[in-house]
């Protein structure tokens, strides 16, 4: 799929890698439109038809006040890779359709597509992305960030990280990799500016 008005760039990274900070910098400092898969997912899971399907899979107790209990759902997919795969396989097509729609409507020269779960196993569905930026950080840094940011203990932090694919897997689809282990936000911003400039030069 080709987009006439914009150049879609994927960004991904594991939990607590600093990917969200990088995305915010691209939006606020570089004035690029951002399409966020997580935001789209939250909106989609508010739809009655989707709520019904998820309840059929995981039980009516997953619904609270006519909405998906996201904390309960998160706990289920943390404990079960099968449940996580089912949820991703079910939600993926409709999320991807909305991502494409929003990218098509974007009015900036480049559009950042924030997809936390992007990897070799599903990249064929996102082959419209012209470049992919991977944000990574070493394991101990990510564990520390999760413990400080979310109040998790070490075991919980490791469990969350292990649910996701490894940085090594992510790097298989990367055009650019930024190691955010020890970067300040200002240093991260500088790296991102350099990366976007490189992409701009490649497209000219």
Curated annotation (Swiss-Prot):
Entry keywords, A to Z: ATP-binding, Coenzyme A biosynthesis, Cytoplasm, Kinase, Nucleotide-binding, Transferase
Pathway where this protein functions: Cofactor biosynthesis; coenzyme A biosynthesis; CoA from (R)-pantothenate: step 5/5
Binding site for ATP: 16-21
Superkingdom, natural source: Bacteria
Places the protein is found: Cytoplasm
Database matches in InterPro entries: Depp_CoAkinase, P-loop_NTPase
Reactions listed under catalytic activity: 3'-dephospho-CoA + ATP = ADP + CoA + H(+)
Gene Ontology MF, one: ATP binding
The EC number(s) this enzyme carries: 2.7.1.24
GO cellular component: cytoplasm
Residue ranges annotated for the DPCK domain, each copy included: 8-204
Keyword Cytoplasm: yes
Principal cellular location given in the protein's record: cytoplasm
GO biological process entries: coenzyme A biosynthetic process
Stored Pfam families: CoaE
NCBIfam families: dephospho-CoA kinase
Family designation: Belongs to the CoaE family.
Protein role: Catalyzes the phosphorylation of the 3'-hydroxyl group of dephosphocoenzyme A to form coenzyme A.
Protein name (Swiss-Prot/TrEMBL): Dephospho-CoA kinase
Organism: Francisella tularensis subsp. tularensis (strain SCHU S4 / Schu 4)
Gene that this sequence comes from: coaE
């Amino acid at each position: 799929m080709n987009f006439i008005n914009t150049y879609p760039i994927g960004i991904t990274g594991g939990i607590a890698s600093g990917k969200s900070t990088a995305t915010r910098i691209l939006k606020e400092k570089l004035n690029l439109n951002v399409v966020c898969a997580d935001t789209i997912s939250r909106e989609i899971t508010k739809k009655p038809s989707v709520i019904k399907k998820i309840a059929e899979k995981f039980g009516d107790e997953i619904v609270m006040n006519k909405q998906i209990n996201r904390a309960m759902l998160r706990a289920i997919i943390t404990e079960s890779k099968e449940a996580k795969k089912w949820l991703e396989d079910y939600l993926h097509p409709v999320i991807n359709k909305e991502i494409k729609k929003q990218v098509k409507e974007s009015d900036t020269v480049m559009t950042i597509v924030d997809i936390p779960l992007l990897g070799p196993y599903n990249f064929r569905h996102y082959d419209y992305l012209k470049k992919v930026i991977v944000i990574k950080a070493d394991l101990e840094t990510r564990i520390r960030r999760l413990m400080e940011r979310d109040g998790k203990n070490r075991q919980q932090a490791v469990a969350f990280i292990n649910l996701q694919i490894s940085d090594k897997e992510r790097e298989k689809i990367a055009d650019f990799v930024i190691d955010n282990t020890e970067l300040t936000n200002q240093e991260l911003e500088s790296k991102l500016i350099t990366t976007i400039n490189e992409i701009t030069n490649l497209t000219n």
